[in-house]
């Protein structure tokens, strides 16, 4: 189960990330995949990964369904995802879900940067990033006809 990058904006500053349009990442390890998984129920997640081999890009990626479900619970309670080097060791990200008009998760968006910026979720910078990501995802969802629950 993968996510596919459909769009990407890059800053003028240097950031070493290998993501580009068309990149495919394991949903359980990418921040965008994780926000979508966080909106599914446990049975849906179990069925999605039944008989699937989990190949994490880094050592901290989930290695089994129990780890995915544990991560899903935390992500679901938050309503957004922080990722600290799960795909690329020195890259962190914050992601939020995009919903369609029926409230079904159809995608996500994230902001990525140096892992150090994302490690402390309570830092001023991290809070600004989180709020911007949540607002952008809300606007994208509303553009698709979604109305907040």
Please provide the spans of the model-predicted regions.
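Helix-turn-helix DNA-binding module
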Residues: 104
């Amino acid at each position: 189960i993968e996510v596919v990058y459909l769009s990407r904006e890059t800053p003028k500053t240097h950031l070493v990330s290998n993501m580009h349009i068309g990149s495919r990442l394991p949903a359980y390890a990418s921040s965008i995949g994780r926000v979508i998984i966080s909106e599914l129920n446990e049975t849906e997640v179990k069925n999605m990964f039944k008989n699937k081999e989990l190949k994490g890009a880094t050592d901290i990626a989930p290695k089994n369904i129990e780890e995915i479900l544990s991560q899903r619970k935390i992500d679901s309670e938050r309503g957004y995802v922080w990722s600290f080097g799960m795909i690329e060791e020195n890259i962190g990200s914050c992601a939020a879900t995009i919903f369609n008009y029926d409230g079904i998760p159809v995608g996500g968006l994230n902001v990525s940067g140096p892992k150090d910026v994302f490690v402390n979720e309570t830092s001023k910078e991290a809070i600004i990033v989180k709020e911007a990501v949540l607002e952008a995802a809300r606007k994208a969802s509303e553009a698709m006809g979604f109305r907040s629950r």
